[in-house]
């Protein structure tokens, strides 16, 4: 179970008291997290999620609080940091930054259909529109293009011939097209919008969670990350009907530009590289530990399938 920082009931009761939400009824560690420690918290006045942030600089935590406040004020279904009765949102527990947030209704879906994908595309467009231009809150990701080039080059020697050649080709493409990628239209992006970070009740999207990889960056990169997960089949091939539903719903709210249409195949590959590398690193770092490790080969397979992209962006000339 991925509870990196275990907590005892008395510690929790002391921490939760300043929120004025009643007695602690129950709490449970969440096994699904792979980077942070999360607990479901039941208090007399409702259901909540407590997050202890395990990765990233503490000084960047106000970014996440401010971003979620902006999205909450834009009526998007996102968690947001609750304040204590003294108005404090960011607190500390066991030496880690700690946030208490409302627990959103719904559950994750394992198999997405076109209706699910359309709702995710629509919500992602709303997220980007709410934070583009002057509304964007700046934060540089710690897993951007420079990180991919550095970590990818280091990992080449860890791979056998075929995956090494696949990764090298992708790194060469990132180097060649880096300036064009960075010049694409920008906003705040979720940067991790996988199926396990969205909540559904049936086919109704009820929430988007886990913004701890969020940053400012190219909106197309965010689209590519999400589509690679929501619209891939078991062999890593993009499913046309799901992809068209996703992209059509997104573009109905924020039409894609000519530059985005040109870089779409590249960006799908870049999004694969980012998660292939982070999973390879996690697999080495946490080998033999009781930590959820996502399969790196899933994104190696997807990158191989993205060498040819047959689903273009819906772009009106």
Question: In which residue ranges do the predicted regions lie?
Answer:
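Conserved NTP-binding catalytic cores of kinases and kinase-like/nucleotidyltransferase enzymes
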Residues: 1-85, 201-204, 311-317
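Active-site acidic catalytic loop and adjacent metal/ATP-binding pocket
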Residues: 31-44, 49-50, 81, 175-221, ...
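ATP-binding pocket architecture of kinase catalytic cores
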Residues: 43-136
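A cross-family kinase active-site recognition segment
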Residues: 110-164, 184-186, 292-293
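ATP/Mg2+ or Mg2+-diphosphate-binding catalytic cores
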Residues: 153-154, 275-317
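A glycine-centered beta->alpha junction motif in the catalytic cores
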Residues: 98-111, 150-158, 273-289
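Active-site activation/catalytic loop segments of kinase-like enzymes and analogous catalytic loops
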Residues: 220-255, 270-287
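All-alpha amphipathic helical-bundle segments outside canonical DNA-binding/catalytic cores
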Residues: 256-268
